[in-house]
Amino acid sequence: QERAIFGILQQYARSGLFETAYLVDNMIVENFLGDIPVAGYYDGLNDIIVSTFHMINVFENTEPLIGTIQKPQESSRIATIGVASFESGEENLFYPFDLVREKAYYYAINKEKLESDGSLIKKIKTQIKSKMQDNVRVSYGIFPTNYEDDYIFCKAYTSKVQLEKEEEKEENNS
């Protein structure tokens, strides 16, 4: 029953009944966070998911200093969120899509760093160029923050209904 609902909700999004269906895999979020105490397990998972959604929502309603976040194509209504390392560019999406059509990167950069680091734009453009592959449409925005650390939040979109992991295993064994 859960599998059916998982697929049906994605089909509803694809048909336009829902604007977007967001997929998150708790195991992937757990692996990203590392060791989480049992007592705070769900709080830890929910904190990173909610804060990532919150920051993306803030940036989607804020004009970027540089860059443009493109609206996804009409057919790309299944999405996930994630974070990336500013230093390495390594990306951690909260759901493993089979086929990514579009990605948006939200660079949350310390305001003082934006005003003083002359090599910053080159580093960001290099990271963005490295993400442009396999016919994936990529957009980005750079946003000033008062945070001490720099963050990259990301959103990935697909038009393909995603199978649950158990279904994929069954198909591979057939």
Question: Model-found features: residue ranges?
Answer:
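Tubulin/FtsZ superfamily GTPase core signature
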Residues: 1-174
